[in-house]
Amino acid sequence: MILKPKIALYEPDIPQNTAAIIRTCSCLDVMIEIIEPCGFMINDKRFKRVVMDYLDEKMIKFYKNYDDFFKIKKKEKERIILMTTKASTPYSSFNFKITDTILFGRESFGVPEKIHKLVDNRLKIPLSFKKRSLNLASSVAITLAESLRQNKLI
């Protein structure tokens, strides 16, 4: 497998979003990492309806908590890039590396402040004035496509 950036989800809430992200990652041959606990079970019918036959266990890694996630990332010397509406740097002006892990927060909350302090960089997707945020699956697709494009992987 070609080395590519990874997508990580912090305690995802919505099964349909997580399933759509898994499909996107599967279609682009990108590893997805899920930091538990999730707000749903993997056998949830809403999850299964969207993920269909795109669930490849070799491409998904689960972490029991964020401490385990950050320990392994530090050991593997991977940069963790947090996508957040609280950042000031636009994703399009950032230089992604193929060894990056791009982290997305929970749909209902994002990530706690302690996570903001642990990441290497924080980026945002600029939005139209007075809009809060994009759907999580859309945000992953936009950011992942840019990361792959910059690294000439699509």
Predicted regions and their residues:
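Short, hinge-like loop/turn segments at secondary-structure boundaries
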Residues: R49-L55, I98-D100, I142
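Active-site oxyanion/phosphate-handling segment shared across diverse enzymes
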Residues: Y91-T99
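RNA substrate-binding interface of SAM-dependent RNA methyltransferases
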Residues: M1-T85, L148-R149
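Hydrophobic/aromatic ligand-binding patch that stacks against planar heteroaromatic rings
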Residues: T24, K114-I115
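Structured adenosyl-cofactor binding patch, chiefly the S-adenosyl-L-methionine
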Residues: L118-I154
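Ser/Thr/Gly-rich flexible loops in soluble cytosolic domains mediating phosphotransfer, phosphorylation
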Residues: R106-K114, S133-L136
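Short glycine-rich anion-binding loops that position phosphate/pyrophosphate groups of nucleotides
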Residues: T85-T89, R106-F109, F129
